[in-house]
UniProtKB/Swiss-Prot annotation:
One Pfam family recorded for the sequence: IGPD
Gene name as annotated: hisB
Name of this chain's protein: Imidazoleglycerol-phosphate dehydratase
Pathway noted in the entry: Amino-acid biosynthesis; L-histidine biosynthesis; L-histidine from 5-phospho-alpha-D-ribose 1-diphosphate: step 6/9
HAMAP family per UniProt: HisB (MF_00076)
């Protein structure tokens, strides 16, 4: 089983994250931010990655530190769980509809952290959650997971739908990219013989 646990404690947040890449999509998420919990639940369910997140953050300030630090810890956990990356499919691309919204998510588990994020939100907030934090989370995740990640919303009108299509798109892309390719189960998917540089 490809699993990992990460603990991250700063003056701003105290976070514990665990993942099982070969799970069934079970989630136990408690960040204190309702909308964010909803997105992480979706991520687990649609990636089929078991995800546990417990976060105690300075929510009296705002949601920024908790959202970003969960992205950091979750990215680190995924990277650790991938290990040598032998046998993974590595690449995946997904078009994800959510009612009137359509987003595209493309991932390369390359070891080279890059985020291209072309997503606009018609509103500044979804409930109490600042929409600008969606990008902050994706950036923290991509950098710490060591993945190249392109996220683009082609069109959409509802901020909740836009965010949800991005998280679900990432989930389905991760599900495909971390899957073991049975035709190359003992190979690192790179002509270099290694990933990450």
């Amino acid at each position: 089983m490809r699993t990992a646990s990460i603990k991250r404690k700063t003056k701003e947040t105290d976070i514990e994250v665990a993942v099982n890449l070969d799970g069934s999509g079970v989630s136990e998420v408690a960040t204190g931010i309702g909308f964010f919990d909803h997105m992480l639940d979706l991520l687990a369910r649609h990636s089929r990655i078991d995800i546990t997140v417990r976060a105690d953050g300075d929510l009296h300030v705002d949601h920024h530190h908790t959202t970003e630090d969960v992205g950091i810890a979750l990215g680190q956990a995924v990277k650790q769980a991938l290990g040598s990356m032998v046998g993974i499919s590595r690449y995946a691309s997904v078009y994800m509809p959510m009612d009137e919204t359509l987003s595209r998510v493309v991932i390369d588990i390359s070891g080279r952290p890059v985020l291209v994020f072309k997503v606009g939100f018609p509103r500044d907030k979804i409930g109490e959650f600042d929409t600008e934090l969606v990008r902050e989370w994706f950036n923290a995740f991509a950098v710490n997971a060591g993945v190249t990640l392109h996220v683009e919303t082609l069109y959409g009108e509802n901020s909740h739908h836009i965010a949800e299509s991005c998280f679900k798109g990432l989930a389905r892309a991760l599900r495909a990219a971390v899957a073991i390719d049975p035709r190359a189960a003992n190979e690192v998917p790179s002509t270099k013989g290694q990933l990450g540089g």
